[in-house]
Amino acid sequence: MAADLLDVHGLLFKRQQYKEADLLAKLWTKELGIVTVIAKGGMRPKSQLAAAVLPFTEGTFGILTRYKGISQLRTYKKLSQHDELFTDLDKNAYLSYLFDLADHAFSEYQKLGGYYDLLLVAFNRIVAGQDPEIIAQIVQLQLLDAFGVAPQLGACVICGKEKGIFDYSIAAGGVVCSDHFRSVSRLHLSPKATALIRTLALLPISRLGEIQIGEDLKKESRRAIAQIYQATVDLHLPSLRFLNEVRGS
């Protein structure tokens, strides 16, 4: 199969040295999904590709690709870089985890659909200074569908009731209303935590405004999401361990 030279738009979210002077990098792209590229000579100080392979660089990347395996980074233009991420440990830890999580939800060259914008909007919101914990919880909850384990959050799993007091049941695969609290095992969340999880899972991230959520409530919803992931996805990501160390949990 002949290789094509084409431009892809997106963000470089991971890189590692390959051999003596080359770099392997992962791109989150609108056109092709996740793509691993090799930047030949990218480690050399005078490399023309050095600027394009810094972590969390946004832009247009010219790649030589066969739509499988490793593509080759050839050119770049319209780069946008965020130097503050090199010194802001919190932002860096959150972003590294979210893209690592998304990287495990999709195969390479799989179209991302709306998830492309989900991660890009999350990236830009965190860079701009919005609460990274709330942004992270939105992404975590909405990626469950990409993993094939989307919970039912719009209404009670058992009876379909949409309003009232709810709790989350991992066994039932979603929220249950108070009429059925004794019927299934549940997480025994506070009504506020369940309401927050439902809101974050169903809210388009582009519509998220400036909101103030108490630390205790955020911690409760974070623990619940961790339990959901452990029971349904069961990933053990070093990036999550690092994030937990950074945020002290």
From Swiss-Prot:
The keyword DNA repair applies. InterPro entries: ARFGAP/RecO, DNA_rep/recomb_RecO_N, NA-bd_OB-fold, RecO, RecO_C. It comes from the Bacteria. Keywords: DNA damage, DNA recombination, DNA repair. The keyword Signal does not apply. GO terms for biological process: DNA recombination; double-strand break repair. GO terms for cellular component: bacterial nucleoid. Involved in DNA repair and RecF pathway recombination. Belongs to the RecO family. This is DNA repair protein RecO. It comes from Lactobacillus delbrueckii subsp. bulgaricus (strain ATCC 11842 / DSM 20081 / BCRC 10696 / JCM 1002 / NBRC 13953 / NCIMB 11778 / NCTC 12712 / WDCM 00102 / Lb 14). The gene is recO.
